[in-house]
């Protein structure tokens, strides 16, 4: 048997579809397995994973994941993880807690940075400093401001999970898993239930790490173009002090039910007001327990079946659920991250009285499909969609290696073949052959694994207007009971512990300790901006932007329709219109056939919007005024020259070169002959969009807040808020009612939108493709564009009037929804305050995010996250918090930022780390399609390579004096800034800030 650096080789295979050599090693001394994926991807990834099965819902694995990265034997800093983030070129750094495992992955394109990350991560997981104070900070602790003050709980994970438990989508996922696996580790919440987290003790915490965080329970992973031998050499050194131990961490399988079950749960909701269209709705999900991940062909068939049933608007189960009118959007699909796989299907937005009708509808639809079969075009579309995604391997902003690690763990975690989920050619070929030989193959799977499967559980999640109040009262009662049981000495100890924790939090890391952290040097940084190829052509009167990039034989085509041609009353339709084009059918095909055609012949087409400010215009004359009702408003006079922003509805498609003509054919059909007159189908699209926006409030509350806040300061962001923000959610609710009461008026609006947008004079095409394939594609693209309506673009003269006429937003706003935490924002337009752009602001923001704001809002305040954002183009600056138990206190932290910067004295090493982190963010790794889209955005907004190089030079040349200079500008934000808070009505009203309140949910 081959050995190297104390590892013995277990497997050595090539995975041609990934262009990868895969070698599986076992560390002979400890038993740790190491999967080494070797290829030419410069975005190198490593991961350290452990089986971490919880036995209760204290959130022990989750809290430990936080604390592990908060100081270790070799790096005894307060927060080496965030210090590392501050000064790394990493393309990914994080840690993730799953129901049965914890993963510590990182990635970088810089080899030395990669090894630095590895060194810190390995020491963190195997030698963390698990102090009681760290558990208190990250998990939970008592807070008592005075001996006679009320007792409270604080902790980062405690508040993070209060935010998670405010999201009905999140709760449905948790409750469905727990109801499907009630007798296993999946039956409890590894993330932590806020009502149970305070049960966690320090002894349990220490014991959990000692039990599971050992090399004998570790799965080690490497991916990319680094030296495979060096992987083994380094890991051998790290593991050398350990001996093998027996770790009982196996995840037990769930014993199948003998009969189906129904379970009911509640989520916190506000009571709907009469006539507001916001009566809280139920969520229903039907879940099946499936076999373990062993037969790769069966897993592939189940993935294809899941897509065929639910993956598109044309999918028969999805269509039956939506057509029933019982709910507003579909949920479900195949999940294979648990030991036994699951399949689920259900509805969001169900009237409580209709909740029990959903499961019978699902079963009846599956029975009909099992008997009558699928439309062959639907199966063809699903096979092509799954195959295209596997071959493209487009993981978006996540490293490809990370996606492969997570896939490998589906089997590896349970002592099965880690390569099975990675090599897809054989199972795909098997399933294709089976489908060709047995047309009823998927019908048999429906029968065996769904209809005849007694392990089925329907989870009904119902709104409860009093739940949040009951939870608060229960927490208060528990605290009062615990306070009453405390002696004077106990009270003194609680206060002393809180003081000790705060003192430790405020104590800076000694320079000699900070110096231990490995870091790159300024000389390791690339001084030059890397341009993305861009060429401009005019084709048939339309602009074509082309990027010559290697795309592995995939045509990426983005078609842009100029939204500036729309009058104000039609702007909120922008995103909906894109969906309507692709999901309502054409004169020749109904939406089912159109959807199948898209799936059969392309890699997908989806709509989005590109709305952004443009360089070089004074975009906001910020004169504060008061509206007629006495509310201060931000938006007094936008300088609405057309050139101050770009706004496009983008239809983003992709296909192989041989299928590119079919991609163009579909785009031509939807632009020229989309049927917009199907009222029922359009209602479905509107309701899906509405509930999607509602579902985003809790998990993406900081983004919702930021979109609204930035809309105070620049017309581009004001338009973004109207098209994609809270304002659009309110529009969708009104539109859903108007479809019933004034369908002819709605249809007239849609036709008017089409009349304004479908015009090649205001259109652009963005193509990302290698030169050889583009030479063949370009004539077809020119023919396609030539077939579209021409004429004068209507997108300019009137748009300034449109922007000027937009209604003002209140200067200080409270957006309310049922939540246990807040999302607190404050911002201003810095150019209006006299700021002149300098690249040093990227360095300063990096330090604020990973230093001051992190310290004050997360570590001391207990929020999950804190951010600051700045647009070099618009000058808009915003502070944001995420899952924050505080409100006014967080605003005080924002207001004190200038004072912090004024008093800041940085060592050269500290300054260098912040510069490195800023460059890492600027040079974020991108796949080819993302590069092409970034280049398009830069072109449209006037971000030239020269301007980007100047900004980079200023980043690299940042000095401490730049921090002090920005303080003078940020000082003005204290008084000139606007406030937007998303949170509960009770918290917003209790803040006493006089915020103008809008009920969002």
Per-region residue spans from a language model:
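Non-catalytic terminal extensions that flank enzyme cores
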Residues: 1-45
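His/Glu-based metal-binding/catalytic segments typifying zinc-dependent metallopeptidases
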Residues: 38-40, 47-49, 158, 162-166, ...
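M16 family metallopeptidases and their MPP-like homologs
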Residues: 43-53, 79-127, 134-143, 170-195, ...
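Active-site His/Glu-centered metal-binding helix of metallohydrolases
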Residues: 60, 64-68, 577
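Hydrophobic, small-residue-rich alpha-helical packing segments that form membrane-like cores
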Residues: 143-217, 221-273, 278-280, 285
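Non-catalytic, conformational "gating/processing" segments within enzyme and secreted inhibitor domains
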Residues: 154, 206-237, 746-781, 975
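Terminal amphipathic helices with adjacent charged low-complexity linkers/tails
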Residues: 459-483
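Compositionally biased, intrinsically disordered low-complexity segments enriched in Pro/Arg/Gln/His
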Residues: 623-624
């Amino acid at each position: 048997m081959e050995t190297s650096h104390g590892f013995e080789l277990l497997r050595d295979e090539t995975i041609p579809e990934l262009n990868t050599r895969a070698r599986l090693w076992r560390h002979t001394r400890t038993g740790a397995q190491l999967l080494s994926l070797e290829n030419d991807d410069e975005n190198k990834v490593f991961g350290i994973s452990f089986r971490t099965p919880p036995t209760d819902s204290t959130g022990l694995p989750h809290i430990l994941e936080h604390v592990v990265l908060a100081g270790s034997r070799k790096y005894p800093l307060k927060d080496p993880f965030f210090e590392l983030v501050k000064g790394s070129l990493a393309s990914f750094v994080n840690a993730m807690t799953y129901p049965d495992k914890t993963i510590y992955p990182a990635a970088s394109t810089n080899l030395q940075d990669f090894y630095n990350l590895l060194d810190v991560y390995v020491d963190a997981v195997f030698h963390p400093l698990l102090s009681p104070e760290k558990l208190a900070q990250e998990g939970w602790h008592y807070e008592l401001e005075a001996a006679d003050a009320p007792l409270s709980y604080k902790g980062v994970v405690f508040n993070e999970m209060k935010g998670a438990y405010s999201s009905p989508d999140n709760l449905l996922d948790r409750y469905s898993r727990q109801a499907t696996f009630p007798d296993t580790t999946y039956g409890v919440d590894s993330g932590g239930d806020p009502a149970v987290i305070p049960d966690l003790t320090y002894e349990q915490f220490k014991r959990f790490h000692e039990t599971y965080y050992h090399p004998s329970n570790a799965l080690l992973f490497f991916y990319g173009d680094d030296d495979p031998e060096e992987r083994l050499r380094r890991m051998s050194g790290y593991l050398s002090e350990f001996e093998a131990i027996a770790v009982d961490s196996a995840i037990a399988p769930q014993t199948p039910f003998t009969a189906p079950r129904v379970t009911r749960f509640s989520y916190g909701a506000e009571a709907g007001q009469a006539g507001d269209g916001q009566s809280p709705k139920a969520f229903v999900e039907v879940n099946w327990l499936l076999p373990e991940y062993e037969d790769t062909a069966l897993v592939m068939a189940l993935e294809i079946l899941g897509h065929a049933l639910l993956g598109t608007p044309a999918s028969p189960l999805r269509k039956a659920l939506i057509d029933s009118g019982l709910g507003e959007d579909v949920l479900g699909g195949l999940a294979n991250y648990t030991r036994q796989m699951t399949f689920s299907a259900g509805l969001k937005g169900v009237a409580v009285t209709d909740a029990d009708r959903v499961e019978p509808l699902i079963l009846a639809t599956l029975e009909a499909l099992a008997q009558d079969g699928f439309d062959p075009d639907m199966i063809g579309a699903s096979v092509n969609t799954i195959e295209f995604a596997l071959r493209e391997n487009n993981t978006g902003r996540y490293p490809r290696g990370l996606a492969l690690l997570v896939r490998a763990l589906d089997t590896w975690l349970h002592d099965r073949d880690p390569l099975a989920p990675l090599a897809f050619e054989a199972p795909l070929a098997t399933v294709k052959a089976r489908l060709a030989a047995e047309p009823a193959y998927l019908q048999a799977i429906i029968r065996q694994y769904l209809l005849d499967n007694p392990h089925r559980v329907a989870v009904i999640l119902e709104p409860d207007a009093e739940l949040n109040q009951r939870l608060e009262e229960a927490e208060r009662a528990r605290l009062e009971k615990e306070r009453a049981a405390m002696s004077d000495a106990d009270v003194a100890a609680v206060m002393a512990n809180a003081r000790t924790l705060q003192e430790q939090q405020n104590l800076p890391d000694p320079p000699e300790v900070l110096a231990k952290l490995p870091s790159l040097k300024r000389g390791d940084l690339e001084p030059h901006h890397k341009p993305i190829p861009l060429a401009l052509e005019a084709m048939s009167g339309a602009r074509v932007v082309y990027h010559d990039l290697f795309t592995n034989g995939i045509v990426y085509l983005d078609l842009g329709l100029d939204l500036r041609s729309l009058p104000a009353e039609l702007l909120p339709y922008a995103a909906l219109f894109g969906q309507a084009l692709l999901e309502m059918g054409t004169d020749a095909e109904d939406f089912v056939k159109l959807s199948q055609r898209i799936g059969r012949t392309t890699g997908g087409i989806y709509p989005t919007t590109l709305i952004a400010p443009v360089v070089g215009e004074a975009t906001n004359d910020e004169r504060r005024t008061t509206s007629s009702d006495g509310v201060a408003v931000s938006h007094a006079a936008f300088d609405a020259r057309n050139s101050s922003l770009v706004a496009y509805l983008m239809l983003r498609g992709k296909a192989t070169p041989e299928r590119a003509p079919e991609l163009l054919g579909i785009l031509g059909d939807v632009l020229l002959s989309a049927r917009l007159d199907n009222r029922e189908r359009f209602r479905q699209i509107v309701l899906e969009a509405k509930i999607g926006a509602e579902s985003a409030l809790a998990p993406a509350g900081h983004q919702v807040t930021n979109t609204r806040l930035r809309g105070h300061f620049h017309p581009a962001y004001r338009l973004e808020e109207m098209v994609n923000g809270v304002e659009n959610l309110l529009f969708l609710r009104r539109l859903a009612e108007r479809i019933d009461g004034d369908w002819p008026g709605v249809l007239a609006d849609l036709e008017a939108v089409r009349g304004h947008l479908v015009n090649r004079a205001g259109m652009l095409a963005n193509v990302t493709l290698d030169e050889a394939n583009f030479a063949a594609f370009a004539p077809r693209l020119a023919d396609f564009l030539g077939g579209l309506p021409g004429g004068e673009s209507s997108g300019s003269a009137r748009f300034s009037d449109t922007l000027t006429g937009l209604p003002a937003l209140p200067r200080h706003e409270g957006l309310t929804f049922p939540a246990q935490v807040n999302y607190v924002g404050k911002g201003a337009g810095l150019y209006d305050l006299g700021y002149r752009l300098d690249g040093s602001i990227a360095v300063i923001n990096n330090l604020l995010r990973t230093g001051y704001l992190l310290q004050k809002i997360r570590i001391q305040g207990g929020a999950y996250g804190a951010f600051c954002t700045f647009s070099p183009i618009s000058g808009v600056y915003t502070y944001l918090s995420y899952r924050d138990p505080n409100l006014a206190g967080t605003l005080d932290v924002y207001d004190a930022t200038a004072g912090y910067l004024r008093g800041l004295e940085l060592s050269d090493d500290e300054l260098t780390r912040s510069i490195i982190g800023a460059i890492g963010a600027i040079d974020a790794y991108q796949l080819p399609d993302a590069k092409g889209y970034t280049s398009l955005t830069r072109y449209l907004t006037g971000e030239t390579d020269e301007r980007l190089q100047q900004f980079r030079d200023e980043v690299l040349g940042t000095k401490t004096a730049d921090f002090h200079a920005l303080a003078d500008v940020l000082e003005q934000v204290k008084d000139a800034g606007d406030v937007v808070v998303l949170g509960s009505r009770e918290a917003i009203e209790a803040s006493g800030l006089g915020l103008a309140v809008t009920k969002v949910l």
